[in-house]
From Swiss-Prot:
UniProt-listed PANTHER family: FLAGELLIN (PTHR42792:SF2)
The protein's name: A-type flagellin
Source species: Pseudomonas aeruginosa
Posttranslational modification: Phosphorylated on tyrosine residue(s).
GO MF term set: structural molecule activity
This protein's UniProt keywords: Bacterial flagellum, Glycoprotein, Phosphoprotein, Secreted
Classification of source organism: Bacteria, Pseudomonadati, Pseudomonadota, Gammaproteobacteria, Pseudomonadales
Domain of life (superkingdom): Bacteria
Record-level GO cellular component terms: bacterial-type flagellum; extracellular region
Amino acid sequence: MALTVNTNIASLNTQRNLNNSSASLNTSLQRLSTGSRINSAKDDAAGLQIANRLTSQVNGLNVATKNANDGISLAQTAEGALQQSTNILQRMRDLSLQSANGSNSDSERTALNGEVKQLQKELDRISNTTTFGGRKLLDGSFGVASFQVGSAANEIISVGIDEMSAESLNGTYFKADGGGAVTAATASGTVDIAIGITGGSAVNVKVDMKGNETAEQAAAKIAAAVNDANVGIGAFSDGDTISYVSKAGKDGSGAITSAVSGVVIADTGSTGVGTAAGVTPSATAFAKTNDTVAKIDISTAKGAQSAVLVIDEAIKQIDAQRADLGAVQNRFDNTINNLKNIGENVSAARGRIEDTDFAAETANLTKNQVLQQAGTAILAQANQLPQSVLSLLR
């Protein structure tokens, strides 16, 4: 190698190596101080792109978890209100059964009905005031809401809540489309009544009548006999008129027939021309009737019996809605568990890409520190090489 003064190759080479070790030392210091292996795109362009995508997914999963928790809270709010509505309906049912009892006077039934009216208002109040985040849940305006429970678009769970006011809660039962009149007994005898509905059992009911009974007494006896038959039909006497109500779910095409047969004259013991109480057919068919909880009136025994049927159906409606809300809460719970699992694994993958390996980076730091110190010492010696030319000039 030529001995020159203007160009010090050894010094230039040492400077280059010293710059490289200094740059590596700065990189190690930055990685150790930030905890991140990728601090700019130049550190790992492809890794930066992948890590950013994974970061977006992790952030989305965290938001989705919060959204799912909001969904659980909303469902719990609605379900709690429906529990109270169920309690109210159970109380109304108790009052209806109490009113249906024959020991109650008209004034007692009126008092019982007064409490029912207050409970109807409370049902409406719960429906109108149950809110979550300012949004009403049970007044019918909620409809169906979608909860974003994923890190990508359109990963949703839909929750629907129906109206649960007293007016919307309804029950179906079958009411005879007409009433039958009963005439007073003119002779003692037996009234034979064939009663039943389609899809249910049918029985013959025999009612013994006395010759001196009024039409009202005869009607009460016939109604009691029908009720005792327990074939799913309720009979109610009002004066000399009998009306019928069938339980919800029974076929409305059924018919009731009431006819006098085999009348026996009490004083002769033989069949004759005298008649016991005359009964005209109460109904030839049932008409399907839909009543709401808001229309319940238990001021009469007949109304109380119908109220029980309506309330039973209303409780079924609420139970169905509560079951849906319970199911969606379980779904949200499972979704949250899955989101947490995904988030954990995605975070681990991102960490492997962008996090600093402190063991390896500390080793790099030590190496670069030694190289920098050595390079500085060697550079000092390299810079002294041109001075050797002076010995040739002496």
